[in-house]
From Swiss-Prot:
It catalyses: RNA(n) + a ribonucleoside 5'-triphosphate = RNA(n+1) + diphosphate. GO terms for molecular function: RNA binding; RNA-directed RNA polymerase activity. RNA-directed RNA polymerase that replicates the viral (+) and (-) genome. Pfam families: Mitovir_RNA_pol (PF05919). Forms a ribonucleoprotein complex with the viral RNA. Since the viral RNA is not encapsidated, ribonucleoprotein complex formation appears to be the strategy to survive in the host as persistent virus. It comes from the Viruses. Its EC number is 2.7.7.48. GO terms for cellular component: host cell mitochondrion; ribonucleoprotein complex. Keywords: Host mitochondrion, Nucleotidyltransferase, Ribonucleoprotein, RNA-binding, RNA-directed RNA polymerase, Transferase, Viral RNA replication. It is found in: Host mitochondrion. It comes from Cryphonectria parasitica mitovirus 1 (strain American chestnut tree/New Jersey/NB631). This is RNA-directed RNA polymerase.
């Protein structure tokens, strides 16, 4: 796995210069993309295959540090733009139609956008947002064949097919005919195109007023928790074991804190803020000791030491009119789809105390097959695989303000069951601090703040427990598995359990929007995608994603997403997409080839053939790659050593003399506290890691220089690594980065020997062999690649993969 040189000083410089307007250049930003090498295993051929190949692609390409922001003065859209204008509607539609290959309906889709433009001009973007949002909801329910519930806020006229009238009849007719013939999957590309175009409402420039009522409104349910016996049974069914204590991990964030622009650098003021709510000092001690034992006591003593040292200077500063530090504040994030999310920014010391708990709960979620936190696709695939009833309905429920309204008392009981020392009450007390907001200081009345460590993780874990309790109430005695969860998103494939789930949620005071919930035997909505049986997988891109890809090389990220989901076939890639690209892209043939090779390898080799224990297109390159690789490695080592030294010098000269706090403490006070501040040790730790990484890289260079015969380099690992580079995300208008990328690819082409124009034949080769089992190929002459042995299922090596005798002719 690649590691990046740790350089916190660059962000330190950026924030310091932003506040004090200091002139001068930034410190050198070292971003060596290296691999940590275990020197004891360097002679092990199998162990070094992936290590050396990571080195080839990371060092030669060096693309991970590429920014996708456009700094030019062109009229093209910037990547960080979130809102659309009417002038961009037609281009958006044409791009979506091109990606989904629905050119026969392009005129119909242009009519939709024409009507949207008219509504914008006459009623404004706010009304258009509400209208398209309702059109989207009604369209999804109509495709799912659910009874339509008209909204009371906005009226949308329906046509004879019971689709919104804004959708032209030819599109409706095609979808309905396939639905009646029970082949709705045949309209997959058409539905994707339709929903993507309707999803343009998510990026309309709307004016949203933040709603704080979900935070301060009193509890409206019947009970704030569930019976302890049921909770213990549910947690036992989830195979969660009790924990005595956790290992404390010190962390620091470079994001904004409640008292400064960089949370890591304001730990002294964050410690001082505890005097505004003195009872939280003892609550912090209680939580730390219960979770971390003696190390928790040391953490509390560390915080108290800083508090007591800064207290005299703080009192003087407050008397002179300085701002009083705060424990936390509420920030508003204006998200897409007309949402204003209220995010809590809490104390850095509280975040440090919660960090290990945060990691532990996420570890528990990773072991639950029905959770989609780490893989959004997997839980629904397992649900379809394990589902026995072919006509079973999918209950996709939409929760309203789940984080704010899910009772924290229930989460406290779950924490007390998981941990032997019962830290739940002190955890709740630390989350219920007073948060500064435009409406004054607020405290969460029912739920917990979104944005604090452990917040989302506890929401997801509690959601799993609620489903298991609903299954127990339905008569299940074993673990219930016919569901999937992603945070507050849930799909249940059982009638009785779904009914009990609704009762539980009503008891707990959570509201479920029936109008937004998708309940159907055809498909449902999960993780912003429509999913169902028979590989029915409808995903719709937002405007921001489409325009983002339009600036990137060839839109191939979007195209390969369509490929991966079965919307189009691999053999259509060149005739339907690449050959129809504008002429401006012809100059990037080598980029095209590498993007195609990387993604097709990921699709074909990554999924189906590997499932059969076969590894295609795998050969070892010879020793001729070693000299150029050594030169590249040595150049990178020298560059990163210089960058690391420049960063250290900048830190010593300027890094610790600029205040980052907002409450008015004198700069010399912070300088006096440097030896005991967490930020000092975190920065030193990062520099030590950087030094260690570079030392290991130099050791690898030395061993490769004098023991090159111990290495075997597999081409498959190179191509696998290419799927993680930034080539598909490259902004083609950034000429410097395009030129640098092309130069690196030419170097890599000399090593890997994939000539320009060979990607089409590469696809044909993979597709031809990927359909055969066992695979038998006598000879493949194209592109100078020769197969020495037939591809069979005999002679398996390293975890069931066939080592093929490929080599460069």
């Amino acid at each position: 796995m690649a590691m990046i040189i740790h350089d916190p000083v660059y962000k330190l410089w950026y924030a310091x210069r932003a506040k004090s307007n200091l002139p001068g250049l930034a410190p050198h930003k070292t971003e060596s993309i290296t691999t940590v090498l275990s020197l004891t295993n360097v002679k092990n051929k199998q162990a070094t295959n992936s290590i050396l190949l990571n080195k080839i692609t990371d060092l030669v390409l060096g693309l991970k540090a590429f920014s996708i922001k456009s700094k030019g003065v062109r009229t093209t859209l910037r990547v960080n733009k979130h809102w659309i204008t009417p002038k961009e509607f037609p281009r958006f539609v044409k791009l979506v139609v091109w990606c989904t290959r629905t050119q026969e309906h392009e005129d119909s889709f242009m009519k939709i956008i024409g009507k949207c433009d008219h509504i914008w001009q006459t009623a404004g973007p706010n009304f258009l947002f509400k209208y398209l949002k309702e059109v989207m909801r009604l369209s999804v329910r109509r495709i799912a064949n659910i009874e339509l519930e008209p909204s009371k806020k906005i009226f949308v006229k329906l046509n004879k097919f019971r689709f919104p009238n804004i959708i032209p009849l030819p599109i409706c007719d095609q979808i309905i005919r396939d639905q009646n013939d029970q082949v709705l999957w045949a309209s997959k590309r058409l539905i994707i195109c339709l929903l993507t175009i309707l999803s343009v409402h998510r990026v309309l420039p709307t004016k949203v007023v933040p709603d704080y009522s979900t935070i301060v409104d009193p509890f409206t349910g019947v009970s704030k928790t569930i019976d302890q016996k049921l909770l213990r049974k549910a947690i036992h069914l989830l195979n969660i074991k009790r924990v005595k204590q956790l290992k404390l991990k010190i962390t620091g964030s470079m994001k904004a804190g409640p008292n400064g622009k960089i949370s890591l650098l304001t730990s002294s003021v964050d410690a001082l803020s505890f005097i505004t709510q003195p009872t939280k000092i003892f609550t912090y001690l209680d939580f730390s000791v219960r979770v971390y034992k003696f190390r928790g006591l040391l953490l509390w003593m560390w915080m108290m030491c800083i508090l007591l040292i800064t207290l005299p200077y703080a009192i003087v500063s407050f008397m002179l009119g300085a701002l009083i530090p705060i424990m936390g504040k509420l920030s508003v994030v204006y998200d897409q789809a007309g949402k204003a999310r209220i995010v809590a920014i809490t104390n850095s010391w509280i975040q440090t105390a919660f960090y290990s708990l945060h990691l532990h709960v996420f570890k528990l979620l990773k072991n639950i097959d029905q959770d989609g936190t780490f893989d959004q696709e997997r839980p629904f695939k397992l649900l379809i695989k394990w589902l026995n009833e072919p006509t079973q309905k999918f209950y996709g429920f939409d929760l309203t303000a789940a984080t704010d309204r899910l009772p924290i008392d229930l989460q406290v009981d779950i924490l007390n069951i998981i941990f032997k020392n019962s830290p739940g009450s002190s955890w709740r007390s630390l989350l219920r601090i007073k948060y500064k907001s435009p409406q004054g200081f607020l405290t969460y009345a029912v739920g917990q703040p979104m944005g604090a460590y452990s917040s989302f993780a506890m929401l997801a874990l509690t959601h799993h427990v609620i489903v298991q309790v609903a299954a127990l109430n339905s008569g299940f005695t074993t673990r219930f598995t016919d569901y999937c969860i992603l945070g507050d998103d849930i799909v249940i494939a059982h009638d009785t359990v779904a009914s009990e789930y609704l009762k539980l949620m009503e008891t707990l005071g959570l509201s479920i929007s029936s109008g937004k919930s998708v309940i159907s035997s055809e498909f449902t909505e999960f993780a912003k995608k429509l999913k169902g049986r028979n590989n029915f997988d409808i995903f719709y891109r937002s405007w921001f994603s489409i325009i983002h890809f339009e600036k990137q090389i060839l839109h191939l990220c979007t195209v390969f997403e369509l490929l991966r989901r079965g919307v189009c076939e691999l053999y259509d890639l060149y005739p339907q997409y690449i050959n129809k690209l504008p002429k401006i892209y012809l100059r990037y043939n080598l980029l095209i080839d590498w993007v195609v090779v990387a993604f097709t390898n990921q699709i074909l080799i990554g999924d189906r053939p590997r499932a059969d224990g076969i590894r295609l297109f795998d050969y070892f390159v010879g020793l001729e790659v070693i000299p150029p690789l050594l030169r590249i490695m040595l150049h990178t080592i020298k560059k990163d050593w210089n960058g690391l030294w420049n960063s250290i010098k900048y830190t010593l000269n300027k890094g610790f003399v600029v205040s980052q706090v907002r409450v008015g403490l004198p700069d010399w006070t912070e300088l006096f506290l440097l030896p005991i501040l967490p930020s000092t040790y975190i920065i030193i730790r990062d520099y030590c890691r950087s030094f260690n990484d570079l030392t290991k890289l130099f050791g690898e260079w030395w061993l490769l220089r004098f023991e090159s015969e111990s290495y075997q380099v597999s081409i498959l690992d190179v191509i696998d690594r290419l799927a993680h580079t930034s080539i598909p995300n490259l902004d083609i208008h950034d000429k410097k980065k395009v030129k640098l990328t092309l130069d690196n690819l030419y170097k890599l082409s000399l090593i890997v020997n994939i000539p320009s124009g060979g990607a089409r034949r590469y696809i044909e080769f993979l597709r031809f062999n990927g359909l055969k089992s066992p695979l038998i190929v006598e000879r493949y002459i194209k592109d100078g690649i020769r197969i020495e042995k037939p591809l069979t299922l005999q002679g398996l090596h390293r975890s069931g993969d066939i080592q093929l005798g490929f080599k460069i002719s």
